Swiss-Prot record:
One of its GO terms (cellular component) is photosystem I. Its cofactor is divinyl chlorophyll a; divinyl chlorophyll b. This is Divinyl chlorophyll a/b light-harvesting protein PcbE. It holds the Pfam family PSII. This low-light-adapted strain contains 8 pcb genes. Induction: This transcript is strongly expressed between 4.5 and 72 umol blue light/m2/s. The whole antenna complex is most highly expressed under low light; as the light levels increase antenna complex levels decrease. Thus at least in this strain the amount of antenna complex is controlled mostly at a post-transcriptional level. Transcription decreases upon iron starvation. Belongs to the PsbB/PsbC family. IsiA/Pcb subfamily. The chain crosses the membrane at residues 27-47, 88-108, 149-169, 210-230, 250-270, 315-335. It is found in: Cellular thylakoid membrane. GO terms for molecular function: chlorophyll binding. InterPro entries: PS_antenna-like, PS_II_antenna-like_sf. The gene is pcbE. SUPFAM superfamilies: Photosystem II antenna protein-like. The keyword Metal-binding does not apply.
Length: 361
């Protein structure tokens, strides 16, 4: 957190990040607990949507978000290929159980375990330094070797998630709106296609290409993760390489930029693409409008739409506005990380009445 040179700063209760800034075990605990909150929300919302689902109304016209995602993954279909909600309750309950496990882990890291992993005794009772694996994940915000080591593990997990998705589509199958049925999809690892889809991914209409992109990302992320785990800073840590800029606030700002950018991309993708977001589950494509800010409106017949808007409209607009505010948070924290003191702004505004300009001869 930005201290503006104060060695002993005091933060308000609303500055939640200050509680975990230099306490790596609590930092992990907050991440795990946050994961539990997400899992609980996903599970509870899935069960709630399943309880109110009306088979006589198109799914996309019922304002649902969790069940359409499961349907796109090929979950909830009977042997005849019709969506009945089969196994959806299991998915929801599984997420709730996972949320309790995550919550317990978050409490353990926050309350029971050492506040800093650097003081952890590790998995072995002898306490030898080489056996204190948890200590390797201590937080040293201005140490690029420490940060690149932690970043590498994040990238590996992202890569594994991509592999899971690709293998799920290949073995189990996912919903293909072109044939309106579940089918197994083999990834198309054509690097030319993957490169070209950087610029027209919103119009992509082939599930094979979608899976190929995820397969490439899996390779790229795991390779990058291994690189970051195994390597250290090359040469002297100079100002050119970010010395003095790398900090907890800087890392927070980059994280906000990443999630904000992904949310905005998801908004545009969901609004127009019917291969990844089938009309059967999300409703008709949207039309982009401009008012005070950009927004999307429904284009189909809204008669009988339960919530007034399709699932696609809810997802696109909510993602866009969340992404927008995440990016504002990125700018705020990035500017603070660069050393700008926003208190000077409020001080300048407060002293406007007392400001005087003297003209000399």
């Amino acid at each position: 957190m930005q201290t503006y040179g104060n060695p002993d700063p005091t933060y308000g209760w609303w500055v939640g990040n200050s509680v975990v800034t230099n306490k790596s075990s609590r930092f992990i605990g907050s991440h795990v607990a946050h994961t539990g909150l997400i899992a609980f929300t996903a599970g509870a919302n899935t069960l709630w949507e399943l309880a109110r689902f009306n088979p006589d109304i198109p799914m996309g016209h019922q304002g649902m978000v969790s069940i359409p995602h499961l349907a796109s993954l090929g979950i909830g279909f009977d042997q005849a290929g019709a969506w009945t909600g089969q196994d959806v309750a299991f998915v929801g309950i599984f997420h709730l159980i996972c949320s309790f496990v995550y919550a317990l882990a978050g409490l353990l890291h926050s309350v029971i375990f050492s506040e800093d992993t650097q003081n952890s005794s590790g998995l072995f009772a002898d306490g030898r330094p080489e056996h204190r694996q948890a200590a390797r994940f201590k937080l040293e915000w201005d140490n690029p070797d420490n940060q690149t080591f932690i970043l590498g593990h994040h990238l590996v997990f992202f890569g594994v998630a991509n592999i899971w998705f690709v293998e799920w589509a290949r073995v189990h199958g996912i919903y293909d709106p072109a044939i309106e049925a579940i089918r197994q999809v083999n990834y198309n690892l054509d690097l030319t296609q993957i490169w070209n889809h950087q610029f027209d991914f919103i119009q992509i209409d082939s599930l094979e290409d979608v899976m190929g992109g995820h397969a490439f990302l899996a390779f790229f992320q795991i390779g990058g993760g291994a690189f970051h785990i195994a390597t250290k800073q090359i040469g002297t840590y100079t100002n050119f390489k970010g010395a003095g800029l790398l900090s907890a606030e800087a890392v927070l700002s980059w994280s906000l930029a990443g999630i904000g950018w992904m949310a905005i991309i998801a908004a545009f993708w969901c609004a127009t693409n019917t291969t990844v977001y089938p009309e059967a589950w999300y409703g008709e494509t949207l039309q982009l409008k401009f008012g005070i800010s950009p927004y999307w409106i429904d284009t189909g017949n809204m008669d009988g739409v339960v919530t007034g808007h399709t699932s696609r409209a809810w997802l696109s607009n909510v993602h866009y506005y969340l992404g927008f505010f995440f990016i504002q948070g990125h700018l705020w924290h990035a500017i603070r990380a660069m050393g700008f003191d926003f208190r000077k702004v409020t001080s300048a505004v407060a002293n406007l009445d007392n400001s005087r300009i003297t003209l000399s001869d």
